[in-house]
Amino acid sequence: DLNGEVSSGGRVCWRSTAINLSRSRTAAGAEPSMVPQPDSEGEWTSEKPIPAPEDTGRAFARVTGDVNPIHMHALSARLFGFPRAIAHGWWTTGRSLAVLGVDESLPGRRLEIAFRRPVELPSTPFLCSRVGADGEISFGLFPAAPAPSGADPVRALVAGVVSG
């Protein structure tokens, strides 16, 4: 685990725990433990395309300074075993939260993200979400538009829960 904390004026304003490069085998039919488990029930209500053009990784690097060959170009990504360049995980998270409209309301809330499989570039994954009675937002980024009943976070490229 990688733990981080940011303080301002002696007050903690951000805290995170990142579990990186974690792989495990599960028994047949068992859910992987790294997938956020939403408490909310109900139908997945939104299905929105999230265009990820071929230059997404380069644009993200220009803004953040996070230059990584797997995000820059298909040629450099192949050197690391990827068939194409892949979107940065924080790009997929940030873009999903912006489309859901929760990017401005995150302070004081909990965000759990599981990066299940890479978002290859270019592609247009689909964002599905549902909101529980308690205001918890569950979302998944899927490689193709699933039927509402098929929006299972275990099948998502990226799965997340915003709560609190």
Predicted regions and their residues:
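HotDog/MaoC-like acyl-thioester-processing domains
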Residues: D1-P49, P118-L121, F126-G164
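Catalytic strand-loop segment that frames the active site of acyl-thioester-processing enzymes
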Residues: A18-A87, G101
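Hydrophobic beta-strand-centered segment that forms part of the acyl-chain substrate-binding groove
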Residues: D1, G81-F82, W91-V131, E136
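Small-side-chain structural scaffolding
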Residues: G4, S16, G57, A61-T64, ...
